[in-house]
C-alpha cells in the first residue's frame, strides 16, 4: 500500500511561526490527521474515527493549555484515540518522529496508551477509570504541595461504565477544583449510535447534578472549545466540558453524523483500502493548502511517501470461529425460543448481527456495562430463559466477576461467550489480551470452561453448552488460524477428553488454544529433525478432565502443556491437580506467559513470549536436555 505522511520538519516550522494560535491548531490538527491515517494504515489496524474526533482537543491541550500551568496532566481515558494522542505528542516534540511507523509494533507504540511510552502517565484501554485516576493525581499533588491541573478526556460510550458515575460522587464534595473532564460526545460508539446502544440522555445536566460546573460546546471548533475551557476555569470549581464532536471529523465522507438508520460506521477500527486512503489524504491536503492560502501565512509543506509492509498471505485453509458461531447461535435459537443473547456494544465482534436481525425480541443490547449485563442474565435465567452473555474475554471475566459468582450461587444456568481470548491479536495491547480469564473464572460454582478449536467444534460445543445443566464459559479465539485438513476427523466432543491430532512417543504436547495448536503442529516438524516425535493433543475442556482419558492417553509421557494464558491460574494447574490424584508416571512441564503481554504484530508477540513454533521447539529441546 502506497502511503503518504508529513515530515516532522514541517511541524517544527509551523510551531515556530508567530501566528494566531487557533489557526495554528487547525493546521496542526489536519496535518496530524494525515499522519494518523499513515500510522494506522502502516500498522494495519487502529481507530480512525475516535482519533479524528479528538485530535483538535488534544492539540489545544498539549500545545496551548500546557503553557498555563505549573504542572498539567492531560490524558485520554477512552484509549481508542491512541493514534491521535501519539501524533499530538510527536507534533509537539514529546515523542520521537520515527515512532510514526511503529504503531502496534513491539519496539514502538502499543495499541492503547501505556506508561512505558514517554510522556504517557497512565495505562488506558479498560474503560471508565480516567476520572478516578485523575482524583488520585490531584490528591497526590496536594500532598506534595504542587499546584496541578488535570484534564481527562472521556468518550460518550465510556459514560456507560458504572465506575464513571461512582467517580463523580465526591468530586464536588472534595472540592477537586483542579479537575476538568472533557467528554468527546460524538454520539457514536464502536459501529452504531450511542442512542441505539444505550441512550445517555441529558449528559450536561447529569454532570451538573453532581455539583460539577458543566458547559457544552462544539468540540471540533477550537474557538468554541477554548471559550468553554476559559468559562469553566474562571469558576474555580470542578468542571466538565461536553465537547460535541463528529466521529471521523476532518474527512467529509468519514463523518459519523452521515450514518443512516440501520447502518454500521465503517471507520471505527481497522485499516482502509488504498482508494479510500488516497481520497482522504487529498481532501486533507487541499484543506490545509486552502487554509494556508487564505490566511496568507508564509508556510508550505510537502507530502512524503512510504510503502506499508506486505501482509503475508496464508496458503492453507484458515478457520474463522466468529462466522461459525454466528451461524450456530442463530440455528440453535430457531429451535429453542428460550435462548436470549445479551451484548456489550460488540455486536460485530461477537457475531450477533444475524441473531439481532432474526430475533430482535430476544436480543438485548446492554452497552458498555458488563456488570449490568451479567446481572440481567442472572434473573433471566431464574425466570426460565437461557441467557448467553457476549463481550471480549478480558472484559467479560474481570469487571463483572462478582456478578458472575452471584449468578452461580443462585443455581441458575448462564452461558458466557468471551471473544478475543488469549494472547492474540496482540495489537490492542494488554488491556484487551485475555490471558488471565481462565484464572478469573476459576472457583465459580458449577461452571465449565471450554474452548473450540475449529469451526465444527463451535457448533458442537455450543450445542453441548445449551444441553449442560452447568454454567458455561466459552473461550473464543477471534483471529483466523490454520489447522490440518483432517482435524475434525481426528477430534470429537466428549466431556473431559482431549483429541490426539498426531501420535508420538515419550513427549506429549497438549494445548487448548487453536492459535497455539497451529504453532505446536509446526513445531513438531522441527522436533522430528532432532529425533523428537511428540504426541499432539488438542484439549477443548479447560477445567474438566476424564480420569480414564488421562490414564490411557497421558501416562508414561513427559507432558508439556502450552498455555495461551498466564502460567499461574491456567489449565496446567488444573490438569496437574487431576493427574496428582492418580498413581501415574507423568512428568509435567508448562510453557506459557509469565509477564504482562506485549503489544505488537502477532508474530513479534508469539516470538517474544516464547509461543511461536520455533520458540516452542527450542524450549522443548531444552526441557528434554534437563
Predicted region positions:
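N-terminal capping segment at the start of a domain
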Residues: 29-45, 184-186
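Active-site pocket-lining segments that scaffold enzyme catalytic pockets across diverse folds
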Residues: 43-62, 321-334
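Non-catalytic terminal/interface segments that mediate subunit docking, oligomerization
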Residues: 295-387, 394
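Conserved thiamine diphosphate
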Residues: 145-146, 195-228, 410, 414, ...
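Cofactor-binding active-site loop characterized by glycine-rich and histidine/acidic residues
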Residues: 7, 39, 51-173, 494
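General beta-strand structural signal in soluble alpha/beta enzymes
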Residues: 50, 76, 152, 216-218, ...
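Thiamine diphosphate
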Residues: 96, 105-178, 347-420, 435, 548, ...
Amino acid at each position: 500500500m502506497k502511503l503518504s505522511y508529513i515530515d516532522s520538519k514541517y511541524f517544527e516550522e509551523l510551531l515556530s511561526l508567530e501566528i494566531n494560535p487557533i489557526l495554528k491548531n487547525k493546521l496542526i490538527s489536519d496535518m496530524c490527521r494525515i499522519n494518523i491515517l499513515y500510522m494506522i494504515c502502516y500498522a494495519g489496524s487502529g481507530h480512525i474515527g475516535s482519533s479524528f474526533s479528538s485530535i483538535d482537543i488534544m492539540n489545544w491541550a498539549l500545545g496551548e493549555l500546557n503553557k498555563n500551568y505549573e504542572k498539567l496532566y492531560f490524558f485520554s481515558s477512552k484509549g481508542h484515540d491512541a493514534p491521535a494522542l501519539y501524533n499530538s505528542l510527536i507534533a509537539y516534540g514529546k515523542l520521537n518522529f520515527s515512532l510514526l511507523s511503529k504503531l502496534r509494533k513491539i519496539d514502538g507504540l502499543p495499541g492503547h496508551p501505556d506508561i512505558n511510552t514517554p510522556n504517557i502517565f497512565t495505562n488506558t484501554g479498560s474503560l471508565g477509570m480516567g476520572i478516578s485516576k485523575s482524583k488520585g493525581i490531584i490528591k497526590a499533588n496536594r500532598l506534595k504541595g504542587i499546584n496541578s491541573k488535570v484534564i481527562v478526556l472521556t468518550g460518550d460510550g465510556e459514560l456507560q461504565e458504572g465506575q464513571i458515575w461512582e467517580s463523580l460522587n465526591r468530586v464536588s464534595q472534595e472540592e477537586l477544583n483542579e479537575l476538568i473532564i472533557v467528554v468527546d460526545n460524538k454520539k457514536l460508539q464502536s459501529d452504531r449510535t450511542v442512542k441505539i446502544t444505550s441512550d445517555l440522555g441529558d449528559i450536561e445536566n447529569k454532570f451538573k447534578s453532581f455539583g460539577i460546573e458543566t458547559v457544552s460546546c462544539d468540540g471540533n471548533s477550537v474557538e468554541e472549545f477554548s471559550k468553554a475551557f476559559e468559562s469553566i476555569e474562571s469558576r474555580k470549581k470542578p468542571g466538565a466540558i461536553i465537547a460535541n464532536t463528529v466521529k471521523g471529523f476532518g474527512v467529509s465522507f468519514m463523518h459519523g453524523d452521515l450514518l443512516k438508520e440501520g447502518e454500521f460506521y465503517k471507520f471505527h477500527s481497522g485499516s482502509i483500502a488504498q482508494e479510500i486512503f488516497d481520497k482522504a489524504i487529498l481532501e486533507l491536503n487541499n484543506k490545509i493548502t486552502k487554509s494556508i492560502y487564505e490566511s496568507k501565512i508564509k508556510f508550505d509543506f510537502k507530502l512524503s511517501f512510504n510503502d506499508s509492509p506486505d501482509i503475508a498471505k496464508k496458503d492453507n485453509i484458515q478457520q474463522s470461529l466468529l462466522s461459525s458461531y454466528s451461524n450456530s447461535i442463530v440455528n440453535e435459537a430457531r429451535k429453542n425460543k428460550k435462548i436470549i443473547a445479551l451484548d456489550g456494544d460488540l455486536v460485530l465482534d461477537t457475531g450477533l448481527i444475524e441473531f439481532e436481525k432474526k430475533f430482535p425480541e430476544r436480543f438485548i443490547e446492554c452497552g458498555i456495562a458488563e456488570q449490568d449485563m451479567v446481572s440481567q442474565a442472572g434473573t433471566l435465567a431464574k425466570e426460565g430463559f437461557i441467557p448467553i452473555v457476549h463481550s471480549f474475554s478480558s472484559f467479560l471475566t474481570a469487571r463483572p466477576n462478582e456478578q458472575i459468582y452471584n449468578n452461580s450461587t443462585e443455581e441458575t444456568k448462564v452461558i458466557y461467550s468471551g471473544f478475543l481470548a488469549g494472547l492474540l491479536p496482540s495489537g490492542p495491547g494488554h488491556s484487551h489480551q485475555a490471558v488471565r480469564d481462565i484464572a478469573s473464572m476459576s472457583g465459580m460454582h458449577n461452571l465449565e470452561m471450554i474452548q473450540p478449536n475449529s469451526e465444527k467444534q463451535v457448533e458442537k460445543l455450543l450445542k453441548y453448552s445449551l444441553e449442560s445443566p452447568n454454567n458455561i464459559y466459552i473461550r473464543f479465539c477471534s483471529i483466523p488460524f490454520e489447522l490440518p485438513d483432517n482435524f475434525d476427523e481426528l477430534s470429537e466432543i466428549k466431556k473431559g477428553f482431549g483429541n490426539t491430532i498426531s501420535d508420538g512417543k515419550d513427549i506429549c504436547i497438549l494445548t487448548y488454544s487453536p492459535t497455539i495448536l497451529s504453532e505446536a503442529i509446526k513445531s513438531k516438524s522441527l522436533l522430528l529433525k532432532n529425533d523428537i516425535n511428540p504426541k499432539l493433543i488438542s484439549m477443548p475442556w479447560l477445567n474438566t478432565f476424564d480420569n480414564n482419558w488421562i490414564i490411557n492417553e497421558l501416562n508414561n509421557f513427559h507432558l508439556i502443556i502450552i498455555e495461551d494464558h498466564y502460567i499461574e491460574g491456567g489449565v496446567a494447574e488444573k490438569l496437574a491437580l487431576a493427574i496428582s490424584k492418580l498413581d501415574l508416571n507423568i512428568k509435567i512441564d508448562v510453557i506459557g506467559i509469565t509477564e504482562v503481554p506485549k503489544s505488537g504484530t502477532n508474530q513479534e508477540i508469539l516470538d517474544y513470549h516464547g509461543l511461536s513454533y520455533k520458540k516452542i521447539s527450542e524450549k522443548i529441546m531444552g526441557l528434554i536436555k534437563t
